[in-house]
Amino acid sequence: MVLSAADKSNVQAAWGKVGGHAADYGAEALERMFLSFPTTKTYFPHFDLSHGSAQVKGHGAKVAAALTKAVGHLDDLPGALSELSDLHAHKLRVDPVNFKLLSHSLLVTLASHLPNDFTPAVHASLDKFLASVSTVLTSKYR
């Protein structure tokens, strides 16, 4: 999915407002995903998945760091996320549908924390961005 100039601007502006909360929002999105889609827990059998657990917070920080990197490389998502794509495809073998579920949970989390900034245009741009990230992360499954 190609991001337009307006999409890129919207994504950068929205992620800029996330600021220092990125790791917290990442953890919150994971918690939302685990609660809303319990089958996603199967990829984390060694995690304490309770609210506020250090492991969920740590993985949320990793998710946030990857998205921050992606926002900084909107013109080269495949290059920026190549190692992460390899990890999820070849080592972790995460079912690709889970990226869509996490993307949805991230959108809900961002909408709840940035209600005044989460316009329909920003929502659409973030959705396209997360779909693009998901496409890159699943590109090496073939």
UniProtKB/Swiss-Prot annotation:
The keyword RNA-binding does not apply. Heme b binds at H88. Gene3D superfamilies: Globins (1.10.490.10). InterPro entries: Globin, Globin-like_sf, Globin/Proto, Hemoglobin_a-typ, Hemoglobin_oxygen_transport, Hemoglobin_pi. Keywords: Heme, Iron, Metal-binding, Oxygen transport, Transport. Pfam families: Globin. GO terms for molecular function: haptoglobin binding; heme binding; iron ion binding; organic acid binding; oxygen binding; oxygen carrier activity; peroxidase activity. Residues 2-142 form the Globin domain. GO terms for cellular component: blood microparticle; haptoglobin-hemoglobin complex; hemoglobin complex. Red blood cells. The keyword Transport applies. O2 binds at H59. One of its GO terms (biological process) is hydrogen peroxide catabolic process. Heterotetramer of two alpha chains and two beta chains. Belongs to the globin family. Involved in oxygen transport from the lung to the various peripheral tissues. This is Hemoglobin subunit alpha-1. It comes from Bubalus bubalis.
